[in-house]
């Protein structure tokens, strides 16, 4: 994030103004030492008093990502990255979720979506893919609890409450503000047919009016968008249960395809101030991607393809009933762009994307994908003024 920084390994109680920067390699040496100690001395998963306490596998996952960054400076770290995460994959303590489970198993949905639903996210709740789940306790059950916590739901869930005919509900992710939108690259070009990660349960593209007793006569324009009655090419009566028809301008923050991982609804807080469900920080799906990247960096493209295919076996499992072999990748398809695309497919809205792009030295190129290009014609939303020498590092706080 910052490049060379002052390295402080002992606490101090006296203000100092004479700090000087230490080289990244020197700082990395201390990070490496700390990670090795953590991987050896933290408890194994399930041994801590509380399941949310850190364990060896959390340290291994963190080490894998840190070593991949260090490997861009010293290639010997790529082998260390692979060695760090492999015990998570082979240790028998985790498994990719590939079947319905938990409290919503009888409801419409799919097994990938089950992982991200309130009450399904912890290992004790059946999520054996979870490595580290940051537990968000329901504040009204905690003496002195606060709701001033992460805002992911308000960021990622569109502002459906602005649509006539919609009411806040768990089925639509609660009340959002639509602060973030996935790019057109993700919406229209990232996913292949049959990928469960792009199902309507996971990237919601279609909705239905859910307000009880809703009925309204409206106009529809030549493009199929909602307009006032008698202002379009025809009138229709919309009712509860009909598919939502947006206004043309609603795609800014009211209605657009969005990941559903952060949706949740607390009926005692209809306004939906903050996140009430758990926060997935590390899971086995990313472990395979970290190892695939480490293998690719060592020239083992077949090993990288094997790891990615494990994820794709899960993602295309149902679709392969009608299209055998769908989603399979081969070694000659593997490069860093493919791995970054697969990270987006698997980890959309979960990973810190900027940090991933900075550590892979791809921010300058990949950020261009965010310049919205419509399916038919380019827009004028082009990112300009980017300087990789300046904009990949942050000022020291």
Positions of PLM-derived features:
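Extended, hydrophobic/aromatic-rich amphipathic alpha-helical segments that build helical scaffolds
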Residues: 1-9, 24-42, 51-89, 132, ...
């Amino acid at each position: 994030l910052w490049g060379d920084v002052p390295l402080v390994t002992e606490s101090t109680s006296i203000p100092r103004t004479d700090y000087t920067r230490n080289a990244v390699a020197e700082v990395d040496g201390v990070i490496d030492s700390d990670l090795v100690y953590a991987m050896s001395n933290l408890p194994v998963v399930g041994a801590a008093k509380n399941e949310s306490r850190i364990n060896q596998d959390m340290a291994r996952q963190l080490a894998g990502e840190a070593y991949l960054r260090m490997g861009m400076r010293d290639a010997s770290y790529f082998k260390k990255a692979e060695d760090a995460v492999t015990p998570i994959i082979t240790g028998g303590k985790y498994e990719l979720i590939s079947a319905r489970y938990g409290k919503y198993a009888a409801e419409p949905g799919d097994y990938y979506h089950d992982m991200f639903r309130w009450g399904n996210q912890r290992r004790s709740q059946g999520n054996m893919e979870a490595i580290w789940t940051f537990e968000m306790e329901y504040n009204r059950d905690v003496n002195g609890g606060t709701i001033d916590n992460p805002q992911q739901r308000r960021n990622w869930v569109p502002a459906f409450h602005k649509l006539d005919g919609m009411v806040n509900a768990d089925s639509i992710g609660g009340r959002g503000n639509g602060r973030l939108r996935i790019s057109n690259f993700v919406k229209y070009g990232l996913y292949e047919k049959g990928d469960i990660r792009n199902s309507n349960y996971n990237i919601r593209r279609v909705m239905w009016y859910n307000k009880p007793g809703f009925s309204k006569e409206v106009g529809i324009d030549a493009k199929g968008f909602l307009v006032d009655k008698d202002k379009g090419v025809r009138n229709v009566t919309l009712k509860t249960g009909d598919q939502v028809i947006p206004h043309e301008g609603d795609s800014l923050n009211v209605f657009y395809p969005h990941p559903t991982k952060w949706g949740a609804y607390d009926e005692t807080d209809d306004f939906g101030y903050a996140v009430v469900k758990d926060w997935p920080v590390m899971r086995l799906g990313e472990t395979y991607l970290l190892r695939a990247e480490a293998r690719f960096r060592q020239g083992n493209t077949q090993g990288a393809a094997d790891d990615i295919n494990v994820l794709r076996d899960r993602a295309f499992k149902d679709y392969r009933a009608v299209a055998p072999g769908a989603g399979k990748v081969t070694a000659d398809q593997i490069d860093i762009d493919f791995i970054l695309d697969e990270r987006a497919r698997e980890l959309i809205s979960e990973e810190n994307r900027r940090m991933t792009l900075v550590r892979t030295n791809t921010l300058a190129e990949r950020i261009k994908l965010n310049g919205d290009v419509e399916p038919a014609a380019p827009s004028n939303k082009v990112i300009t003024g980017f300087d990789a020498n300046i904009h990949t590092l942050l000022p020291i706080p």
